[in-house]
Amino acid sequence: MGFHFQGAESIISADGETVVKKRARKAYRIEALDLKIINGRTKREAKILRKLEALGIPAPRLISTYGDTIVMEKVEGTVLKEMIDSSDNPGALFRDLGALVSRLHIADIIHGDLTTSNFIHGSKIYAIDFGLSYISRKDEDKAVDLYVFEKAVGCAHDAKFLEDFYCGYMGEGSESVLKKLGTVRLRGRKREAMAFG
């Protein structure tokens, strides 16, 4: 069964075993600049998908890429957010998710939009939607990735499950990232205080 979805950044359609993601043009940008930005982002996302496959990290397999379009394998399963909402043991799902995000960060992949809607639960948990992703070795970037996730969880789920998430996340390189996360949280609280003060 196929589907067609248009978001702010791309048009996504799926049929059979493949998903086609075509980046949307921005009418307010000069056409030549728009094409350069779109093609650059498409190449970056394709590069990350190749790296994920090479490392054995669960994510859609890249089939082909051209210009503004990526063709990838369709991942069968349920959006993780829905699975968590109906699960008798959501803590276990959050621990598995933490372990997967840890693998991304160990590989220096910053997802850029960590929410439970950007993971699919099938035979395992798969990370999807790498449209905002990039490569970085900086603890700061990994910490911001986690901070965005914390905010998303606070809006969609019970924040108590973050403890399970971090149980799964703990491992290689996590100590320095979590230390930096403390600084990022403090900065976020100061911004919020200024906004409401």
From Swiss-Prot:
UniProt GO cellular component terms: chromosome, telomeric region; cytosol; nucleus
Domain Protein kinase: 1-197
GO MF terms, alphabetically ordered: ATP binding; hydrolase activity; protein serine kinase activity; protein serine/threonine kinase activity
Alphabetical list of SUPFAM superfamilies matching this protein: Protein kinase-like (PK-like)
Main location: cytoplasm
One Pfam family from the record: RIO1
GO biological-process terms attached to the record: tRNA processing
Reactions the enzyme catalyzes: L-seryl-[protein] + ATP = O-phospho-L-seryl-[protein] + ADP + H(+); L-threonyl-[protein] + ATP = O-phospho-L-threonyl-[protein] + ADP + H(+)
Origin superkingdom: Eukaryota
Binding site for ATP: H4, F5, Q6, G7, A8, E9, S10, I11, I12, K22
Function: Component of the EKC/KEOPS complex that is required for the formation of a threonylcarbamoyl group on adenosine at position 37 (t(6)A37) in tRNAs that read codons beginning with adenine. The complex is probably involved in the transfer of the threonylcarbamoyl moiety of threonylcarbamoyl-AMP (TC-AMP) to the N6 group of A37. BUD32 has ATPase activity in the context of the EKC/KEOPS complex and likely plays a supporting role to the catalytic subunit KAE1. The EKC/KEOPS complex also promotes both telomere uncapping and telomere elongation.
UniProt family annotation: Belongs to the protein kinase superfamily. BUD32 family.
Name of the protein: EKC/KEOPS complex subunit BUD32
Organism for this UniProt entry: Encephalitozoon cuniculi (strain GB-M1)
Phylogenetic placement of the source organism: Eukaryota, Fungi, Fungi incertae sedis, Microsporidia, Unikaryonidae
Gene name per UniProt: BUD32
